[in-house]
C-alpha cells in the first residue's frame, strides 16, 4: 500500500490547482527524480511486507518497535505482516521478523489523514549494526526550507505498478505547516496540525513509500502520508508530523 496521490489530477488542474475539500486521495507511490542508495546511508529504513510482498516503508524506533503510517495498516492482520531490515533490497538480504502486533493512532481519520501514524511491534529484537540503527524522534519541527531526505522503494514513474529492487532516496526541503496551508500551495485547510510538508524543485512532489521516513538534522521529522498530483510544484508531499505526534509514539512503544 503505497503513498496516497490523486489520480484525478485533471480535475484539480481544471480548477486552477485548487483541490476540492473532501476529494479523497487514491493509492499510488513513487520516488521520482531520486537516486539508488544503500541501507548503510539510511539504516533506520525497513520494508513492511504483506504476505512477502513490499507494502510500505517504516523507521526503526527501537530494537522491537517500528514507526509507520496508520493507513498502511488498514484491513490487515498482524499474521500476514513482516519487516525486512538491514538490506538495500526489499526482497533479499538483511533480516526479517514477523509482526506480533500493531497499533494505529486512535485519532487517525482516513478521510482527512490526520494522525496518520502507527507503531509495529516485532517478534524478537533487532541487533543494531552499521545497516540497522534506530532513529530519534524530532521534538520540534525544522525550519521552513531546511534540507531533508526521503527514502523508500516507491515506484519510479507515475502509474507504474513495478517497484525498484534497490532502495531509492530524494533530497527535499521542508515546507512548514503554515506555509503548506497558505495560498502559496493548493492544499489550504486540508493541511492539519498533525501534518508537515516537503518538496523539491524539479522532483516529484509525492516522493516515497507510505510510512517511510522524512529525515532532517539526523532525526525523524515526518512519516510519508499523502499528496496530490497535477501541478507538482503547487502540491508538496504531505507527512505525518513526528514532533506533533511524538508523545503518542513514546507512550505506545
Curated annotation (Swiss-Prot):
Name the PROSITE patterns for this protein: TRYPSIN_DOM, TRYPSIN_HIS, TRYPSIN_SER
Which leading EC class covers this enzyme?
hydrolase
Q: What is its EC number?
A: 3.4.21.4
Active site located where? 71 (charge relay system), 116 (charge relay system), 210 (charge relay system)
Predominant place of localization: secreted
- List where in the cell it is found: Secreted, Extracellular space
Query: A single Gene Ontology molecular function, please?
Result: serine-type endopeptidase activity
Q: Which domain of life is it from?
A: Eukaryota
| Catalytic activity of the protein | Preferential cleavage: Arg-|-Xaa, Lys-|-Xaa
Q: Where is the signal peptide?
A: 1-22
Q: Where is the Peptidase S1 domain?
A: 31-253
| Gene Ontology biological process terms in this record | proteolysis
The cross-references to InterPro entries, in alphabetical order and at most eight, read: Peptidase_S1 (IPR050430), Peptidase_S1_PA (IPR009003), Peptidase_S1_PA_chymotrypsin (IPR043504), Peptidase_S1A (IPR001314), Trypsin_dom (IPR001254), TRYPSIN_HIS (IPR018114), TRYPSIN_SER (IPR033116)
- What S-S linkages are listed for this chain? 56-72, 180-197, 206-230
Where does the record place a coiled coil? none
Q: Name one GO cellular component term.
A: cytosol
Keywords attached to this entry: Disulfide bond, Hydrolase, Protease, Secreted, Serine protease, Signal, Zymogen
- Report residue numbers covered by any propeptide: 23-30
Q: Which Pfam families match?
A: Trypsin (PF00089)
Q: Of which family is this protein a member?
A: Belongs to the peptidase S1 family.
Q: Which protein is depicted?
A: Trypsin delta
| Organism listed in the record | Drosophila melanogaster (Fruit fly)
Taxonomy, top ranks, is: Eukaryota, Metazoa, Ecdysozoa, Arthropoda, Hexapoda
Amino acid at each position: 500500500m503505497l503513498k496516497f496521490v490523486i489520480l484525478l489530477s485533471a480535475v484539480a488542474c481544471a480548477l486552477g490547482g485548487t483541490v476540492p475539500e473532501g476529494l479523497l486521495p487514491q493509492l499510488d507511490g513513487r520516488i521520482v527524480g531520486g537516486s539508488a542508495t544503500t541501507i548503510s546511508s539510511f539504516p533506520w529504513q525497513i520494508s513492511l511486507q504483506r504476505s512477502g510482498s513490499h507494502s510500505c516503508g517504516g523507521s526503526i524506533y527501537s530494537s522491537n518497535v517500528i514507526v509507520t503510517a496508520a493507513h498502511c495498516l488498514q484491513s490487515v492482520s498482524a499474521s500476514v505482516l513482516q519487516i525486512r531490515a538491514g538490506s538495500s533490497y526489499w526482497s533479499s538480504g538483511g533480516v526479517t521478523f514477523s509482526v506480533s502486533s500493531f497499533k494505529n493512532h486512535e485519532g487517525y481519520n482516513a478521510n482527512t489523514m490526520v494522525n496518520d501514524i502507527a507503531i509495529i511491534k516485532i517478534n524478537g529484537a533487532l541487533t543494531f549494526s552499521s545497516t540497522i540503527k534506530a532513529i530519534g524522534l524530532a521534538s520540534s519541527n525544522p525550519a521552513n526550507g531546511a534540507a531533508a531526505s526521503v527514502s523508500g522503494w516507491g515506484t519510479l514513474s507515475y502509474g507504474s505498478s513495478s517497484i525498484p529492487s534497490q532502495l531509492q532516496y530524494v533530497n527535499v526541503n521542508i515546507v512548514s505547516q503554515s506555509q503548506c496551508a497558505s495560498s502559496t500551495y493548493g492544499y489550504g485547510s486540508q493541511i492539519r496540525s498533525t501534518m508537515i510538508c516537503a518538496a523539491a524543485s524539479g522532483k516529484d512532489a509525492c516522493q516515497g513509500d507510505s510510512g517511510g521516513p522524512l529525515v532532517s538534522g539526523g532525526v525523524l521529522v515526518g512519516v510519508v502520508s499523502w499528496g496530490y498530483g497535477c501541478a507538482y510544484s503547487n502540491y508538496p508531499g504531505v507527512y505525518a508530523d513526528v514532533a506533533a505526534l511524538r508523545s503518542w509514539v513514546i507512550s505506545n512503544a
